[in-house]
Amino acid sequence: MIAIVDDDDLMRSALQGMLKAVGLPAQAFASAEEFLKSGQQRQAGCLIADIRMPGMSGLQLQAQLNAEHCRIPIIFITAHGDEKMRMQALRAGAVEFMAKPFNDEALLESVRAALES
């Protein structure tokens, strides 16, 4: 299962639809806190997360998962990223960092690579 964590309803819906259209099961969460409360951390084969969200950010979510020794491949997506943020995310263990709007095929390729890792 691919977990999607994004505070934007339209983005969550679009990502979930895109993944399901190619046969990849996905579950969407409106916040990092909702994802953590769901208990789905260990079932997720990959996590697509926005970096900037109200409450816990994507980077804080990544730190929490690392603290729990939960090594989910994380693909960050953001409309507000810069090179400094990209490097911070990659140093913390993200497998990909994509700026919105992103190419759907590039995202799917990153998801497939993350699932195979």
Predicted regions and their residues:
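Alpha4 helix (beta4-alpha4-beta5 surface) of REC/receiver domains from two-component response regulators
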Residues: 60, 81-96
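Active-site residues of response regulator receiver
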Residues: 50, 78
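Short, conserved "switch-loop" micro-motifs in signal-transduction and mechanochemical regulators
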Residues: 68, 79-81
